[in-house]
């Protein structure tokens, strides 16, 4: 059995693992990373963020072609099969793997392929795909193994018509009708993607509102546009059982309803990838969803073992995971690169997309904070008219007296890009966080960023 010694060993090469590895390597630590795949990137690159967003982009291009009258001179509306559209995602994945492999090579980080499990607090054992066993001994460890779709034991995911958000990327046909169970972020994103391909979608929501953590107005706008694209949303429903057929599935709901479709996509929750880590050997416990509890330093209950990314739960975003991993490594090397990642913008890649940061109206009302609202509707923005993307708005919530920006909410094209301007101003100290910044700053014209100036003037006009 080969034994290797390192300063830090990182389990996983997704965003959290990469963030930890890159930061620790800058401080001269001898590092190794372990991943179950032969290629880096984790589920984010291979099954989650990258393929789903590349898929969304392709579908959005199809929608633009089919709805823009100018293209009728070229040909009639075209519909593409799901496998054909998925090919564009494959091209992006290969480019991402090449780029990220270069990062590890340039920083002289050793890479091991296999399944890792803890032997004790200083040792992990790696079983390679060939069955060989290697031991890695280190002073510190970072667990960044990510998560996977939650699979209830009473549903047969081996049935050829039953998928989760990982296996849906292997779908070899385009269903005419699809049931999506779970109306969280992933469920809503795939509802947009499949409806954009002309698939009839039944979106089953276990709650009474889509994405209830969003501002009510944004949530309502999402519901409207999904329904406008032939998505049938069913709120307050729970499954009783899933019946697999030769040519489809029937979803039996506890309300007594039955829904038949060509396929079922299960999008109801995720589970941390911790079951094979041998955490019982080091005394680390996980919750019912397999997630590890950490403190504000991303340290687990074992002082030399840290954890970051989806494996610790909220917010389960690739953007946050990278910073969490970087911060965990910052604690290991005792640098000033540490921070607890809590103020994270939300990016939801539906069609149109959604992004927000800060408080929403319900939260401010409950806290009895005197706020006002400024809005800019995209249909009045020159850039939106030029790009034929009139749907959406930017909404700024600010304090009536101090003009401090309390929240920014955006629905529409480029929402996940636009939100960062508001985020930058909200992060300014004291009086520098003010709505006046947007009225006293010259924006390029025409741009979508100009919506901040329009929304700011709208908000100021409401004051008296």
From Swiss-Prot:
Disulfide bonds: none annotated. This is Soluble pyridine nucleotide transhydrogenase. It is an enzyme of class 1 (oxidoreductase). Conversion of NADPH, generated by peripheral catabolic pathways, to NADH, which can enter the respiratory chain for energy generation. Its cofactor is FAD. It catalyses: NAD(+) + NADPH = NADH + NADP(+). NCBIfam families: PRK05249.1 (NF003585).
């Amino acid at each position: 059995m080969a034994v290797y010694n390192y300063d830090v060993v990182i389990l996983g090469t997704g965003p959290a693992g990469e963030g930890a590895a890159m930061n620790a390597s800058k401080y001269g630590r001898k590092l190794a990373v372990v991943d179950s795949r032969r290629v880096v990137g984790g589920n984010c690159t291979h099954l989650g963020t990258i393929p789903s967003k590349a898929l969304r982009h392709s579908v959005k291009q199809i929608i633009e072609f089919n709805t823009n009258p100018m293209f009728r001179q070229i040909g009639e509306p075209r519909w593409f099969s799901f496998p054909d559209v998925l090919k564009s995602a494959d091209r992006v994945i290969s480019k991402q793997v090449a780029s990220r492999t270069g990062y590890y090579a340039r920083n002289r980080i050793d890479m091991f392929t296999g399944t890792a499990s803890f032997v004790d607090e200083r040792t992990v054992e790696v079983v390679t795909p060939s069955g060989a066993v290697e031991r890695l001994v280190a002073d510190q460890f970072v667990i960044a193994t990510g998560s996977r779709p939650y699979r209830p034991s009473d549903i047969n995911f081996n049935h050829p018509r039953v998928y989760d958000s990982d296996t849906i990327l292997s779908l070899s046909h385009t269903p005419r009708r699809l049931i999506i169970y779970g109306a969280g972020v992933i469920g809503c994103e795939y509802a947009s993607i499949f409806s954009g391909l002309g698939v009839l979608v039944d979106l089953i929501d276990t709650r009474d509102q889509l994405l209830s953590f969003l501002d009510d107005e944004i949530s309502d706008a999402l519901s409207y546009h999904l329904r406008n694209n032939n998505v049938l949303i069913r709120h307050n429903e729970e499954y009783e059982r899933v019946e697999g057929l030769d040519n489809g599935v029937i979803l039996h709901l506890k309300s007594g309803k039955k829904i038949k479709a060509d396929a079922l996509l299960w999008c109801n929750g995720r589970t941390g990838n911790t079951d094979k880590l041998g955490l019982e050997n080091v005394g680390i416990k996980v919750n019912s969803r397999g997630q590890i509890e950490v403190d504000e330093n991303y340290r687990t209950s074992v002082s030399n073992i840290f954890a970051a990314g989806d494996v610790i739960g909220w917010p389960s975003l690739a953007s946050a995971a990278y910073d969490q991993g970087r911060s965990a490594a910052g604690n290991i090397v005792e640098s000033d690169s540490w921070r607890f990642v809590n103020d994270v913008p939300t990016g939801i890649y539906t069609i149109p997309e959604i992004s927000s940061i800060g408080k929403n109206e319900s939260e401010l009302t409950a806290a009895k904070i005197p706020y006002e609202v400024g809005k800019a509707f995209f249909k009045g923005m020159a850039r939106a008219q030029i790009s034929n993307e009139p749907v959406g708005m930017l909404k700024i919530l600010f304090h009536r007296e101090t003009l401090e920006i309390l929240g920014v909410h955006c629905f529409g094209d480029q929402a996940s890009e636009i939100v960062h301007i508001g985020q930058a101003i909200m992060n300014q100290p004291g009086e520098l966080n003010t709505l006046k910044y947007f009225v006293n700053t010259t924006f390029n014209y025409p741009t979508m960023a100009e919506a901040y100036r329009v929304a700011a003037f709208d908000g100021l006009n409401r004051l008296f």
